[in-house]
Amino acid sequence: MDRRMWGAHVFCVLSPLPTVLGHMHPECDFITQLREDESACLQAAEEMPNTTLGCPATWDGLLCWPTAGSGEWVTLPCPDFFSHFSSESGAVKRDCTITGWSEPFPPYPVACPVPLELLAEEESYFSTVKIIYTVGHSISIVALFVAITILVALRRLHCPRNYVHTQLFTTFILKAGAVFLKDAALFHSDDTDHCSFSTVLCKVSVAASHFATMTNFSWLLAEAVYLNCLLASTSPSSRRAFWWLVLAGWGLPVLFTGTWVSCKLAFEDIACWDLDDTSPYWWIIKGPIVLSVGVNFGLFLNIIRILVRKLEPAQGSLHTQSQYWRLSKSTLFLIPLFGIHYIIFNFLPDNAGLGIRLPLELGLGSFQGFIVAILYCFLNQEVRTEISRKWHGHDPELLPAWRTRAKWTTPSRSAAKVLTSMC
């Protein structure tokens, strides 16, 4: 196999990895290193005095061969990136003949072997992960859309807490849609060079992906903040708090994503904006996410503390305790699901722990929207009751509007009445 084809084959085998990891392209590090080596080699060759004797310095696509005299053998080690596949360091020789450089001996595939069977298994693994997260996001979109329809269509379910849930559902739909858009824009062809590919659509898809991810984290945090406010206050202003959450939950992601896009356009408009591993501007996106994860985890611990105190028998009647529990149980199932997960990985480098991170964040994580829809809608007793009433002809929408508002959405002064079974 020709040395150029051998190098290209290795990179093609690695190409499924960026499809799964999104913004991490390890093969681009290899290509970038080769391009730098080629540039240095050609520059050194130009600086060497011209001579008709021997063989000039040359770049063969993988290694830079220095100037050599006629009849001289030159031995060079395999390119550095081959060390990722084998601990044994190979070497390649070339003879400077009267007609020029000879072919490398032994050939690159022999001197610099790559375990293609292992790479084929990894390719199959990454393809399987992609299938799993595609199925997971698809199921989540359907479930979330149904959940939003239910919460919007049934007026007796209208209350600030369910409004917050609806916003969270929407962010999961956006996040899943952004994944599909990014896959379509960046990985529509196996021949795409991810290291130099640059179109308006691919940049928009990457920016949309970052925005959707930030909104998802911000509304996960909003869920924790809102529940903290309800549990900690005896007379919470639910609707006013909701509109503050709307402003922060959507406004901050717009601000940070817009700032990141501006920095990319002005200072780092290269490739498809997804080579963020060493970019300082990546922290405009990652920094707020890491901070929100830490705050969310702290709020989770505070919620547990409040619930333990409020659920003590001495604190109130069994009826009040039941109301607190019914209010918080779905959120308590959700916050640990995300908090523990992200508290482990978000403070680590992006390429750390990929063996565990891939199946959790991409595989299991793609079903998170589906899980949220189940916890906050389909298993919610009040939602099931309202659906049952409409199904059996007892339409709650036929009740007078003033009765519906007074019973279901208007908070009273009493903490026990504020934390109703519905909101």
From Swiss-Prot:
GO terms classed as biological process: adenylate cyclase-activating G protein-coupled receptor signaling pathway; cAMP/PKA signal transduction; cell maturation; cell surface receptor signaling pathway; cellular response to glucose stimulus; cellular response to insulin stimulus; determination of adult lifespan; establishment of localization in cell
Glycan-linked positions: N50
Domain of life: Eukaryota
Pfam families the UniProt entry points to: 7tm_2, HRM
Keywords of this entry: Cell membrane, Disease variant, Disulfide bond, Dwarfism, G-protein coupled receptor, Glycoprotein, Membrane, Receptor, Signal, Transducer, Transmembrane, Transmembrane helix
Tissue expression remark: Pituitary gland.
Stretch forming the signal peptide: 1-22
GO terms under cellular component: cell surface; cytoplasm; membrane; nuclear inner membrane; nuclear matrix; nuclear outer membrane; plasma membrane; sarcolemma
Protein name: Growth hormone-releasing hormone receptor
Name of the gene: GHRHR
